[in-house]
Amino acid sequence: MDKCKENCISGLKTTVPPGDGPKRVPVTQHFPAQHLPSANSGQAQRVLCPSNSSQRLPSHTQKLVSSHKPVQNLKQKQSQATSGPRPVSRPLSNTQQSEQPQPAAPGNNPEKEAASKQKNEESKKRQWALEDFEIGRPLGKGKFGNVYLAREKQSKFILALKVLFKTQLEKAGVEHQLRREVEIQSHLRHPNILRLYGYFHDATRVYLILEYAPLGAVYRELQKLSKFDEQRTATYITELANALSYCHSKRVIHRDIKPENLLLGSAGELKIADFGWSVHAPSSRRTTLCGTLDYLPPEMIEGRMHDEKVDLWSLGVLCYEFLVGKPPFEANTYQETYKRISRVEFTFPDFVPEGARDLISRLLKHNPSHRPTLKEVLEHPWITANSKPASSHKKESTSKQP
């Protein structure tokens, strides 16, 4: 790899999980370490996060674990949410953490400043490396790399390690997309958003340290069951609407909501797992065409300006697919799908309840300004009548594991 390309990827500064990452939950479950495959290896099956295709292919999920019991208990710390980037460093050792600075009198304290400077320099040196992790079984495979079950050696913290090959990222020209995904996802703190604890890289690969979602992908569940019932659909839509509301409050537009990008936590709660097409939208509207065609709104496929209302459209498409088993505008060709989306042409099967029809019809409006707000979605009568807490469907979700 020439030096120019290496620097292009190395633009990702090495960072590490914050305090609620790999050091909190000791897990004694043991699994044998495996060797990572080469860039051309066909091992593993699906990759967890990168949005690398506009096709409706099962390319972004984690496989389910064989045990019905979750192997970790990741507690979200929503209070740590920040509106901008904040560097994170590897947790200090117990000895270092116990050394608290002594109170100093007002004014300059040369000794304290020197100690603080030394501490900062030491912190910068503590960077993650592959040797810090025990690598377990593959969880998935994708276009740019693989995802593995992993354990941080010191804390025994279970996580998912996403391995992306630099040569493949460069060849596809998506280095900037990866940087954007990391920048956005690493600063989001919400129970329905998969945590990105940190990242690091070596000469050939980029590694993302991710929260592990034991119950796998929503897409896999949907394939297995064909469609979801009203309660499960309304619950997922509620959780997703809450997560999107949080994203929008941080001026983040997701733009690629679909079953392949949604995972299930240990309690069966939904988690957005892929921010490859997401963007910060401080003030401007976007005109880039991205995401999956079945879920794209008219304003995006027509190349018009768009804003956070694109996520409301995707929410309507998702609600329809959960209840029916396929997207509302699905057709044999891209051209036909494009045409149906532009004209908002879709029909409901007889078994779709009236309340759900009303919500979906409100969300799938050609004019973005006519779509409801996320608050109105959460207050919709069909949602409030059918949605239930995530903890109440934990047993239902775990009982369906193979």
Curated annotation (Swiss-Prot):
Transmembrane segments: none
UniProt PTM: Activated by phosphorylation at Thr-288; this brings about a change in the conformation of the activation segment. Phosphorylation at Thr-288 varies during the cell cycle and is highest during M phase. Autophosphorylated at Thr-288 upon TPX2 binding. Thr-288 can be phosphorylated by several kinases, including PAK and PKA. Protein phosphatase type 1 (PP1) binds AURKA and inhibits its activity by dephosphorylating Thr-288 during mitosis. Phosphorylation at Ser-342 decreases the kinase activity. PPP2CA controls degradation by dephosphorylating Ser-51 at the end of mitosis.
Cross-link entry Glycyl lysine isopeptide (Lys-Gly) (interchain with G-Cter in SUMO2), positions: K258
UniProt keywords, alphabetically: ATP-binding, Cell cycle, Cell division, Cell membrane, Cell projection, Cilium, Cilium biogenesis/degradation, Cytoplasm, Cytoskeleton, Isopeptide bond, Kinase, Membrane, Microtubule, Mitosis, Nucleotide-binding, Phosphoprotein, Proto-oncogene, Serine/threonine-protein kinase, Transferase, Ubl conjugation
Region (Activation segment): 280-293
Molecular function GO terms recorded: ATP binding; protein kinase activity; protein serine kinase activity; protein serine/threonine kinase activity
GO biological-process terms attached to the record: cell division; cilium disassembly; meiotic spindle organization; mitotic centrosome separation; mitotic spindle organization; positive regulation of meiotic cell cycle process involved in oocyte maturation; positive regulation of mitotic cell cycle; positive regulation of translation
Modified sites of kind Phosphothreonine: T287, T288
PTM annotation (Phosphoserine): residues: S41, S51, S342
Database matches in SUPFAM superfamilies: Protein kinase-like (PK-like)
Matching InterPro entries: Aur-like (IPR030616), AURKA (IPR030611), Kinase-like_dom_sf (IPR011009), Prot_kinase_dom (IPR000719), Protein_kinase_ATP_BS (IPR017441), Ser/Thr_kinase_AS (IPR008271)
GO cellular component, one term: kinetochore
Principal subcellular localisation of the protein: cytoplasm
Biased composition (Basic and acidic residues): 110-125
Assembly: Part of a complex composed of NEDD9, AURKA and CTTN; within the complex NEDD9 acts as a scaffold protein and is required for complex formation. Identified in a complex with AUNIP and NIN. Interacts with FBXL7. Interacts with CPEB1, JTB, TACC1, TPX2, PPP2CA, as well as with the protein phosphatase type 1 (PP1) isoforms PPP1CA, PPP1CB and PPP1CC. Also interacts with its substrates ARHGEF2, BORA, KIF2A, PARD3, and p53/TP53. Interaction with BORA promotes phosphorylation of PLK1. Interacts with CIMAP3. Interacts with GADD45A, competing with its oligomerization.
Role summary: Mitotic serine/threonine kinase that contributes to the regulation of cell cycle progression. Associates with the centrosome and the spindle microtubules during mitosis and plays a critical role in various mitotic events including the establishment of mitotic spindle, centrosome duplication, centrosome separation as well as maturation, chromosomal alignment, spindle assembly checkpoint, and cytokinesis. Required for normal spindle positioning during mitosis and for the localization of NUMA1 and DCTN1 to the cell cortex during metaphase. Required for initial activation of CDK1 at centrosomes.
Protein name per its UniProtKB record: Aurora kinase A
UniProt gene name: AURKA
